[in-house]
Amino acid sequence: MKKILFAASECVPFIKTGGLADVVGSLPKCFDKRYFDVRVIIPKYLCMSKEYTDKMEYIDNFYMDIGNDNKYVGVFKMEYEGVIFYFIDNEFYFSGAKPYGDLLWDLEKFIYFSKAVLSALPVIGFQPDLIHCHDWQTGLIPVFLKERFHNGDFFRNMKSVMTIHNLKFQGVWDVDTVRTLSGLPDYFFTPDKLEAYKDGNLLKGGLVFADAITTVSNTYAEEIKMPFYGEGLDGLLRARANDLRGIVNGIDYDEYNPATDKFIVKQYNARDFRKEKVKNKLALQEELGLEKDEKKMMIGIVSRLTDQKGFDLIAYIMDELCQDNVQIVILGTGEERYENMFRHFDWKYANKVSANIYYSEALSHKIYAASDAFLMPSLFEPCGLSQLMALHYGTLPIVRETGGLKDTVEPYNEYESTGTGFSFTNYNAHEMLACIRNAERIYYDKKREWNKMVDRAMAADFSWHVSALKYQELYDWLIG
């Protein structure tokens, strides 16, 4: 039995701000229980829902030296859907209204968390063969493991894996502050260890000291070795290329399943989508005040409204696109200029564009079910989950070929009748518009071809079980 511990800053269903929480919450329950004992450890935030905190059972507490201080560490435990979760409790650090705040404060609390995770293991009596760390918040775990803990028998052969969910966030502050907060000796603050461009960098520490590095898609694993995507760490990632692999995220098919989805008006599956899916479109057109027309192509967008997601491209061609015979439904929040741009087009083309500048889980499900196509022209996209949801709902993605989008959406080839979506290569607004118009042409002129693509899209398997098998291979390789 191999014992694995996931360490992260957030996890579904306890606390969520982004895709990281989905991975940490969904992946552990998909491992083969006969060979893998996978548990999770996260901070016990005060802002967690009471329905979970009331069920947590107190295990123990102790005091730990960190920096120049001696800090309280409480440990709680709870079983959820067959997986054991541990929680590190300290109200001084984890009492805010949301999990992240000011960067310097985040830095201090996650340095504390990284050390507390290792210090708590002997107390809870769980001795993992491998600790799987996620993003910069747990970047110091591999460092502490090598520096402070490897002398004792308990930690001697413990391995670590570092997973990059988004390389843009690295946990960077000046060297003196990081040295003081972490209590690490000067030896660790050199350019081949934690120092990057004269600053202390927590993620870099994890990438240098972990036994293996993974990221959330094959293409992204290749891209981050180049300066454009490497965020200043491309040299290190090239040096560690043999230990770096990409494993695509999955989605939870229990939650995102058009056949059982409780948010949508008409449930459907791969056999009956030809006549049932359109009922969701008519219902959404009515709900959002768009022109009711089941034949009109609907393009959905569910996203954070930021540059990373390609909204500068959409801004360039939105007026042109609105001349076409399409409807566009947007859901999300983000940069003010993009929020206002969509509000403007909602006003200008009231029966064609619906801008919903907020976030609603229910509406997102309705958009996945009602739309014919799903637009996602990202500048970079480590994995992306929206296109996987769209595929499963039979809504064909229109994407830029980058990161996980390139790995998961097979572009349509009209000569071979293959593909599950449409893609373009260069980050260029009119290349994107040409791609959208190609999709319109197939939708209006070759509806049978379109429906065959929907068949292939709904049959594609991006469940967590597929990802879990790849992680099991990685663990076998590391632990032996």
Question: For the regions a protein language model found, what residue spans apply to each?
Answer:
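Catalytic cores of nucleotide-sugar-dependent glycosyltransferases that transfer UDP/GDP/TDP-activated
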Residues: 1-480
